Amino acid sequence: MLPRSINILKLRPTTQVTTTALRALATEAKTTLGATPGSTSTSTSTSTATTTTLESTSTSTSGDATETTIKETKSIKRKRTFFTDELNKGPSFDDFVSGKAKDMLEDPLELARKDPNAKLPLWLKVPIPKGKSFHNVKNDVRELKLSTVCEEAKCPNIGECWGGKKSEATATIMLLGDTCTRGCRFCSVKTNRKPGKPDPMEPENTAEAISRWGLGYVVLTTVDRDDLIDGGANHLKETVQKIKFKAPQILVEVLGGDFRGDLEMVKILANSGLDVYAHNMETVEALTPHIRDRRATYRQSLAVLRTAKETKPSLITKTSLMLGFGETDDQIRQTLKDLREVGCDVVTFGQYMRPTKRHMKVVEYVTPEKFDYWRDVALEMGFLYVASGPLVRSSYKAGEAFIENVLKKRKHNVGESPRMLQEVKPSIFKRA
């Protein structure tokens, strides 16, 4: 029970209350409660109440009445100060004076700055994109309202591809918009069940952009459009034909989807006039369900490559595998065997790099030496050409010159030695 001396809430109106008096009463109550035995629960609750800061507002007197307002100041939660806290854990002034600071193995200030997810091996670091050619390509893409896989998929080679000389600068155009109907766990392209309708001017604008760049070899890629009846096959066909009409000398590679397993759509694209039919396996069979969208299957992708080759045997068929998901050597070898069985001519190996924290983590950063090993293994198995390196991507322009050479020789009926093809190992893929 509270002592009468602090029962201030029932004061008579004529009583004059001052801030000093309130503080004195609170102090007296605290002392009294601390000395009263046998009242643990009461004293605890009262002590808690009396320790709350009491603030008496200015007293206004009207006649013989006095109105007193007591406010309880609520405790304010301290803001998070991670950087400051980490700094405080670091060397003190005395540590610097005594010289102990230099012996500390880790500086908490530096640890607070670093992002654990930003740590990459040296061979995966690339220069910041810049240069006149880079900005020219970027302006063309913006002006013609085109999407590129270089930007949408956050490709690390964008500076090299866009920033090359006039005869080399290129961008991989992404057709059917910038939004995919699928959601693979490795891909940073936007997803939506119902993307917008394809731009009817996209084929014409794509052909115009490519003709400006003066290229000999171009790569077109596409998002999956499961919302379209034909999966976008006829849109791709129209784009290829417009490019060939504007510049017949240009060799065209199309990296297409699986069209939900509709092989008739594969045949439409294969007969469109393209020169290289590409479709990516992405990973080994065991990991496919965990990495790719559930609508994409390993066997379905093999069927796409087989059908493209059977439809037009003169086509070069191409696929790509990403390493770093936790795949085993035996699984990779089996995948290469499966690819050779369906007549796949070209394979590329690249390192999976996590685009954002929302995507699956990297299990392993594969060394350049291991990439060289897989290049040699694939060439021994009979692939026409293999590009293998940490920064290699399926649409990476460095391999295009070699494939362009092969296609031109074929068109001029100049026979090439398979052994010669296998011995060519471009140093550009040995990136360090």
Curated annotation (Swiss-Prot):
One of its GO terms (molecular function) is 4 iron, 4 sulfur cluster binding. [4Fe-4S] cluster 2 binds at residues 180, 184, 187. Residues 32-71 are annotated as: Disordered. CDD domains: Radical_SAM. PROSITE patterns: RADICAL_SAM. [4Fe-4S] cluster 1 binds at residues 150, 155, 161, 395. It is an enzyme of class 2 (transferase). Gene3D superfamilies: Aldolase class I. Belongs to the radical SAM superfamily. Lipoyl synthase family. PANTHER family: LIPOYL SYNTHASE, LIPOYL SYNTHASE, MITOCHONDRIAL. This protein may be expected to contain an N-terminal transit peptide but none has been predicted. This is Lipoyl synthase, mitochondrial. It comes from Lodderomyces elongisporus (strain ATCC 11503 / CBS 2605 / JCM 1781 / NBRC 1676 / NRRL YB-4239) (Yeast).
